[in-house]
Regions:
Chain B
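N-terminal intrinsically disordered, cationic/polar leader segments
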Residues: 1-97
Length: 449, 97
């Protein structure tokens, strides 16, 4: 039996623990857990459920902390399957994931199940990832702390899909759902990287009226949005849409008229979550619409520029966002593989983090293939995928944008940190990573004690 | 050279290393904790051993708490802690530096 949850409450989630506690206490066994992702607040109870034989299989975007550590040490019977957000939608639509019961927490619903994520104490904005579960689960249970008068609109989840509604005291902790006001980073390294990312974008042929972009939620990504704003005003360029996980600085661009539409699959901060209900141009999209490679057309197919992060990048431009430098699972695919199909995919990352090189001869785990990566931006300079000679021509003479080969950046990193010993793994596979089309891209093995 | 007193150098900040030397009788004995132990345990010991041998320290207990320090940081902290442990902070051994 397969059960699912969404992770829109992120670190403020109460629903997951309440439901899992009840499932464990009722003595269920051999369940497959298929949430959109797993946050730290879910770790302890998942580890307990695995130890008691309640959960024997997991498919997720990612995992981290004590759960990632336990899985990397071989606690789970079956290998975890990691899927991107677009791939999860594909897998559910195609029947690769068959959800028996979806338990979806919502900050409001009426007594028939018309619900959205935009309003209420525990509002988180877009219900993007959960909408797939709502549409395809055999049985759908909504859990809420806020029953509204019938009929409740806008209805992101509709009464036609809902079997049960359960009222509890609190579905989430609003202070931990999204980060508060996002501050402009003061880290000089992040600022330098962000400025160079901006230089790459605005000096490429993609920077023209009606372009589109996706940024992440990290410090550098937020700073890129600010730099991009200034350049868009200076050059009088407006974007057709911003896509993906949305932050307040992106909503600000919408309100200033610099971006025509925000296509919103999740909201990373309060500002973005709260503005959705008042802004018809901040459009909620589900994970399939966002990024499913097997439906009749996903938004990422129209995406011009994507700015993504990385734990490791290798000299073949492959990216790892899943396993740490110690080989232990500590990340999530998220929309990485999906957004990386953009026409200009930029990875922004520091050359080294502490004594760990970011650019390495070979990544520990391949998550996003090098063929979909176009430019790497570090604080010392950029590297362009040699398959993109067109970008090479556009970017080779930009002041303040030193161009290196990826091999030269790798050597620079190794010179700073030294040569690490190779990691030791056993032969047992503890997790498999799929590419967004459902094919196998890499496996993660159990770490040696 | 003999360790004259227990000494410590460095902090527990990210990218730093804290090294403590105490008197030993059984060669150079390491107690190493590191965020990057899987990749760099031998590299860290090699750097510290090199500095110890330049000061001709043969019997010592070396407690290392490493927070991902780069090699040059480890070397600098080791020089500092050895000078303190040998009670020669006023007479730096310039040829080692």
């Amino acid at each position: 039996m397969t059960i699912s949850f969404h992770h829109h409450f992120r670190e403020g989630d109460y629903v997951f623990n309440i439901i899992m506690r009840s499932i464990i206490d009722h003595g269920y066994k051999n369940l497959t857990l298929a949430p959109s992702s797993l946050t730290n607040v879910m770790n302890d109870i998942v580890v307990e459920a695995i130890k008691k034989g309640v959960v024997t299989g997991i498919t997720s975007s990612g995992m981290r902390g004590s759960l990632g550590d336990a899985v990397s040490h071989g606690i789970l019977k079956n290998p975890v399957i990691f899927r991107s957000h677009g791939n999860r939608a594909r897998a559910i639509e195609s029947g690769d994931i068959k959800i028996d019961v979806a338990f979806l927490g919502v900050p409001n619903t009426d007594d028939m199940g018309n619900a959205n994520g935009m309003d209420g104490v525990a509002a988180f904005g877009s219900l993007g990832y959960a909408l797939i579960d709502a549409q395809y689960a055999n049985t759908l249970v909504l859990i809420t702390d806020n029953i509204k008068p019938y009929p409740n609109t806008p209805a992101s989840i509709k009464q036609t899909q809902v079997d049960y509604i359960v009222q509890i005291n609190e579905v989430g902790n609003p202070d931990k759902i999204g980060s508060g006001a996002t501050r402009f980073t003061k880290d000089p390294k992040e600022l330098k990287i962000a400025k160079m990312v901006n230089d790459v974008i605005v000096n490429s042929d993609y920077f023209k009226n009606d372009f589109s972009f996706q940024t992440g939620s990290g410090g550098a990504a937020l700073a890129v949005t600010r730099f991009l704003r200034t350049t868009m005003i200076d050059k009088n360029i407006k974007a057709a849409f911003a896509l993906g996980g949305i932050t307040k600085p992106t909503v600000d661009l919408l309100n200033e008229g610099l971006v025509a539409k925000v296509m919103d699959v999740q909201d990373f901060d309060k500002g973005a979550a709260e503005s959705m209900k008042d802004n018809p141009y901040q459009q909620e999209i589900d994970a399939s619409w966002y990024a499913d490679p097997a439906n009749k057309g996903a938004m990422v197919d129209k995406l011009d520029v994507a700015i993504l992060s990385a734990l490791e990048i290798d000299t073949k431009f492959n990216v790892n966002v899943m396993s740490g430098s110690d080989g232990i699972i500590r990340g999530a695919i998220g929309g990485h593989q999906d957004a990386a199909t953009a026409k200009l995919t930029i990875i922004s990352a520091p050359l080294v983090r502490g004594r760990i090189a970011t650019i390495v001869p070979e990544v520990t785990t391949v998550i996003t293939p090098g063929d979909s990566i176009d430019v790497i931006v570090t604080e010392v300079g950029i590297a362009i995928n040699p398959k993109r000679q067109d970008l090479m021509a556009q970017l080779k003479n930009v002041p303040g944008l030193p161009l290196y080969t990826i091999e030269a950046l790798q050597e620079k990193a190794e010179k700073i940190v030294g040569t690490p010993k190779p990691l030791q793994f056993t032969d047992r596979v503890v997790a498999v990573a799929e590419y967004r089309d459902g094919t196998l891209i890499d496996v993660i093995k159990q770490v040696k004690e | 050279m003999e360790i004259k007193k227990t000494a410590i150098a460095g902090t527990l900040e990210s990218s730093d290393v804290q090294i403590m030397l105490t008197q030993g009788t059984d060669g150079i004995v390491f107690d190493l904790v590191s965020d990057v132990v899987k990749q760099f345990d031998e590299a860290i010991k090699k750097t510290i051993n090199q500095v110890l041998s330049e000061y001709d320290v043969q019997n010592v207990i070396v407690k290392v708490v490493d927070k991902g320090a780069l090699d040059m940081v480890i070397k600098a902290r080791t020089v500092a802690v050895v000078q303190r442990a040998l009670d020669i902070v006023d007479e730096p051994k310039w040829e080692v530096l």
